[in-house]
Amino acid sequence: MTESERALLTFEQLFDTSRAIYKKQKKILEIVLEPFDITVLQYLLMFKIHQSGSTPLSKLAMSLDLKPASVTRMTDILYKRQLMNRYDSPDDRRIVMIQLTEEGEELIEKAAVQYAKMGAGLYQKLDTSQLQYLRKLAGSLTKLAEGCSEKSGN
């Protein structure tokens, strides 16, 4: 087997594994979010805001790799449900800032706890050293992927 064939096989295995894990995690998250009546994307949007506090809408769109119009539609829905607030940036009125309401923060916290409980089963057969290695490897792969996307202009 040539070096390029080994690299391709490794890439295919990594891609298949990543996709399988993503599908399982997404399914768990969908089950958790059903009683809250929000989608996975809405949850991810709210989680990003939860992590960073008050955030410009354009920055959210970039971090989720979505078009600003899609993020605007999602924030409209969540705003109507009183899960987030929108306001103009004090530095530049053209910039729309998004912030979770107290109700939005509570929803994120409740959903995160339930997701952690259900998602733990996905990794329960791994011991502590395997989990630590997985975290380290995931971090390295994320940095590698970010470096590749910067070089390609994505």
Swiss-Prot record:
This is Uncharacterized HTH-type transcriptional regulator YhbI. It comes from Bacillus subtilis (strain 168). It comes from the Bacteria. GO terms for biological process: regulation of DNA-templated transcription; response to stress. Gene3D superfamilies: Winged helix-like DNA-binding domain superfamily/Winged helix DNA-binding domain. Transmembrane segments: none annotated. The lineage of its organism: Bacteria, Bacillati, Bacillota, Bacilli, Bacillales. GO terms for molecular function: DNA binding; DNA-binding transcription factor activity. Keywords: DNA-binding, Transcription, Transcription regulation. The keyword Transcription applies. Residues 1-143 form the HTH marR-type domain. Residues 57-80 bind DNA. InterPro entries: HTH_MarR-typ (IPR000835), MarR/SlyA-like (IPR039422), WH-like_DNA-bd_sf (IPR036388), WH_DNA-bd_sf (IPR036390). Pfam families: MarR. PANTHER family: MARR FAMILY REGULATORY PROTEIN, TRANSCRIPTIONAL REGULATOR, MARR FAMILY.
